[in-house]
Every structure is written in structure tokens, then in C-alpha cells.
From Swiss-Prot:
Glycans are attached at residues 9, 23, 40, 60. It is found in: Cell membrane. Residues 432-452 have a biased composition (Low complexity). The keyword Transmembrane helix applies. The gene is Tacr3. GO terms for cellular component: dendrite membrane; neuronal cell body membrane; plasma membrane; sperm midpiece. One of its GO terms (biological process) is regulation of dopamine metabolic process. It comes from Rattus norvegicus (Rat). This is Neuromedin-K receptor. The lineage of its organism: Eukaryota, Metazoa, Chordata, Craniata, Vertebrata. It is a multi-pass membrane protein.
Length: 452
């Protein structure tokens, strides 16, 4: 993934340190923003590089990445806003779900994992990364250098695959609702597996992290044993696994779900429960699609930055490359703060939860309806008995020819029509089969709370 602007290889007079930039953790961990080689050409940031003898360069590696104070203040404000909104917003989301029994659904458990990942990246990575990117100086020691290169990839992997798990769960709940849903234990196993895979993917970043103390400068970087080619290959794999592949899965699943939910309703269906549950499912799917699209848009410029600067290395000497990096990194990190805002705007229960969290504000009023939203559980009385039991309780309806006169004396009885067990008390008056069309609407394993 993208890296901070870099210069050429440089040495401290003993060991050559290559600027093998281009990783997720360099935006997440800014691992290798190394010193520019002094010379007559402009620096990677477009700042004039002083002409020094090689011995002077080795002895005086000072920070050449200097910005005006007003620009530093603006960037600090922008990054500080991301951290504040992301940390507090996601912590409130976690509280809303875990503190209210009604909110503890399969989908929401994955949202807890997503919120934890986003809050962790914002709290432990964003500002540290910003400081390193701004000053090109590592102030935080060797242990945090390893953590900074390891944890961000882990957290982003957990975030994107939590969204993928939600997409697959929505797909199964809507397309094949008669199958049992994930239990709480199974959900925990899935979440645990996501984190284990994330740790394995990010482990090389921790293994090869190094600190280099130079005269006037300390650097945190990842030194791959086989050099830049191995580094580039690894991070292309990271881009595929934490961006392209999960987005492909979610694109396919949400497309199928969208066609199912918005492709048309059952002709003549007059059941209120059907419409209520269909509307609730549409809201949840729409909310998650917005979350996924937001993530994709926020991270796209960052990945493009990495690929372009890795292939066209002369871009690292462009005058405004530092500003491009800081902007793309800010946009990527801002993805951690949008989800709580999306939940609050599109989901009435999360909105009620945020009102409760901010009830101390004089302009926030929590109504009795908001309290009930988080405390009351509403189950649909659909399929109170099993499908097999209903199928044995077929109600026989006898139809008469209207031309027969008195139906009590007519012997021209039509074929008995069994009651459709999937109709759920709704009247279906269309040619479309109610048993196939409405099967994705009601399931004995879900309630309205799962979708509202």
C-alpha cells in the first residue's frame, strides 16, 4: 500500500538503508519516510536540498520536510477531528449494542468488531502516523515501531472482513432464510478467525520492523530481506486481500440481495407484516451498502498513490507529493469516523442510542419512544409452529361455481386448495407463487429487531 514520499537510498557511513517504501503500514504505520539524498536536485517534497559533501550528509541527516506553521495547524486540526469522531463515535456504537439486549443480533456483533477495529486504528495509529509523516522523525521507540507496522494491517483486515461477514449473513438471511442463522458461539468463532488471519497477514511487518538511529534523526522502517521487489509483492498481496477481494464478494452478494429486495413485490400482497419486514430489511441492506461504498472510496486514492509511486519513483520528487500523501492518508483514516454517523442517520435504534449517550447536552431530548426503541423486543408471530406442522394442518377451502345457484345444493365442487404454509397469514392474489416469493421475507429464526 501507499507509502510516504521517499528519496533515494542513503547511508549512515556504515550500513546502507534502502527506502523500500510502499506498504499499508506506511500509511497506517508510515514505516519508511527516509531522509533524502542531498544533492543539486529538489527533494521529494519539492524543497531545495542543500548541496553537501557525502561526509557531511552522513554526519548531518536533519529533517528537510518543513512546512509552514499554518499548514501544520490545518493538518493537525483535520487529523484531530478524525481521531475524536472515530474514537468516541465507535465507542458509543459498541456501548449501544452491548448495553442493550435488543441490539445484540448477529449483524450487530459484527458491527461491534468493526467499531473496535476502527476505534483502535484511530486511537493508536492515526496521530502517531501523522506526526511521523509530518516531521519524518520517529519519537516513539522500537517496540511501538513494531506495533505501528503490525497492528494497522491487522485492524484494517478485521474491519473489511467484518463487513464481508455481514454481507454474507445478509445474503443467507434473505436468499435462504429457512436455514438456521449463526449462533452467538458461531459468530464469536468467525470473529476470532478473522483476527487470527489478520495477525498472520501482518506478522511480516512486525518481524522486519527496525529502528535506525542516525545523527539528528531516528527512523522506523521495514527492511525486507530480499529488498524492494519482495516488499512490493507483499503489499500487492495486501491490497488484494484487504481491498479487492472482499469488495468483490460484497459487490456480488449485495447485488443479488438488492435484486431480491427491490426487484418487485408479490402481486396482491396485503399483509402488513410482510411490508414491515421487507422495509426493515431494505433499510439494513441500504445502510451496509453505504458503509461499504464509503470504505471503498476512502481507501481507493491511498492504494492508487502506493501503486503509482512504486512504479513511477520520480513522483516522489514532485513538489507537492507530501501534501498528496497527507491528503490520501487523511481520507483513508477518515473511513474510521463515518460509520457511526451513517448508523445514526439511517437506523432509528442507533439514533435513539446516540440520543441517550448525549442526553447531557441541553439541545438533545430523549423521548419515551427512544427509550422503548432500545428496550422492547418485537417478534413477528410468523411460523409459530414448524413448517412441517403447518404443512399437516392444511385448511381445505371448497370453491363453488357461482352459476350453480344455491351452493348448499351444488354437487360441482372444485378441487380442494391447501393453505400455503409460507403465506404467514397474508393474502396473495397474484399469479406469482407466494411460497417462493415470500420465502425470503419471513423466517422462523429471525425477528423484526434483526433488520430494523
Amino acid at each position: 500500500m501507499a507509502s510516504v514520499p521517499r528519496g533515494e537510498n542513503w547511508t549512515d557511513g556504515t550500513v546502507e538503508v534502502g527506502t523500500h517504501t510502499g506498504n499499508l503500514s506506511s500509511a497506517l504505520g508510515v514505516t519508511e519516510w527516509l531522509a533524502l539524498q542531498a544533492g543539486n536536485f529538489s527533494s521529494a517534497l519539492g524543497l531545495p536540498a542543500t548541496t553537501q559533501a557525502p561526509s557531511q550528509v552522513r554526519a548531518n541527516l536533519t529533517n528537510q520536510f518543513v512546512q509552514p506553521s499554518w499548514r501544520i495547524a490545518l493538518w493537525s486540526l483535520a487529523y484531530g477531528l478524525v481521531v475524536a469522531v472515530a474514537v468516541f463515535g465507535n465507542l458509543i456504537v459498541i456501548w449501544i449494542i452491548l448495553a442493550h439486549k435488543r441490539m445484540r443480533t448477529v449483524t450487530n456483533y459484527f458491527l461491534v468488531n468493526l467499531a473496535f477495529s476502527d476505534a483502535s486504528v484511530a486511537a493508536f495509529n492515526t496521530l502517531i502516523n501523522f506526526i511521523y509523516g509530518l516531521h519524518s522523525e520517529w519519537y516513539f521507540g522500537a517496540n511501538y515501531c513494531r506495533f505501528q507496522n503490525f497492528f494497522p494491517i491487522t485492524a484494517v483486515f478485521a474491519s473489511i472482513y467484518s463487513m464481508t461477514a455481514i454481507a454474507v449473513d445478509r445474503y443467507m438471511a434473505i436468499i435462504d432464510p429457512l436455514k438456521p442463522r449463526l449462533s452467538a458461539t458461531a459468530t464469536k468463532i468467525v470473529i476470532g478467525s478473522i483476527w487470527i488471519l489478520a495477525f498472520l497477514l501482518a506478522f511480516p511487518q512486525c518481524l522486519y520492523s527496525k529502528i535506525k538511529v542516525m545523527p539528528g534523526r531516528t527512523l522506523c522502517y521495514v527492511q525486507w530481506p530480499e529488498g524492494p521487489k519482495q516488499h512490493f509483492t507483499y503489499h500487492i498481496i495486501v491490497i488484494i486481500l484487504v481491498y479487492c477481494f472482499p469488495l468483490l464478494i460484497m459487490g456480488v452478494t449485495y447485488t443479488i440481495v438488492g435484486i431480491t429486495l427491490w426487484g418487485g413485490e408479490i402481486p396482491g400482497d396485503t399483509c402488513d407484516k410482510y411490508h414491515e419486514q421487507l422495509k426493515a430489511k431494505r433499510k439494513v441492506v441500504k445502510m451496509m451498502i453505504i458503509v461499504v461504498v464509503t470504505f471503498a472510496i476512502c481507501w481507493l486514492p491511498y492504494h492508487v498513490y502506493f501503486i503509482l509511486t512504486a512504479i513511477y519513483q520520480q513522483l516522489n520528487r514532485w513538489k507537492y507529493i507530501q501534501q498528496v500523501y497527507l491528503a490520501s492518508f487523511w481520507l483513508a483514516m477518515s473511513s474510521t469516523m463515518y460509520n457511526p454517523i451513517i448508523y445514526c442517520c439511517l437506523n432509528k435504534r442507533f439514533r435513539a442510542g446516540f440520543k441517550r449517550a448525549f442526553r447531557w447536552c441541553p439541545f438533545i431530548q430523549v423521548s419515551s419512544y427512544d427509550e422503548l426503541e432500545l428496550k422492547t423486543t418485537r417478534f413477528h408471530p410468523t411460523r409459530q409452529s414448524s413448517l412441517y406442522t403447518v404443512s399437516r394442518m392444511e385448511s381445505v377451502t371448497v370453491l363453488f361455481d357461482p352459476n350453480d345457484g344455491d351452493p348448499t345444493k351444488s354437487s360441482r365442487k372444485k378441487r380442494a386448495v391447501p393453505r400455503d404454509p409460507s403465506a404467514n397469514g397474508c393474502s396473495h392474489r397474484g399469479s406469482k407463487s407466494a411460497s417462493t416469493t415470500s420465502s425470503f421475507i419471513s423466517s422462523p429464526y429471525t425477528s423484526v429487531d434483526e433488520y430494523s
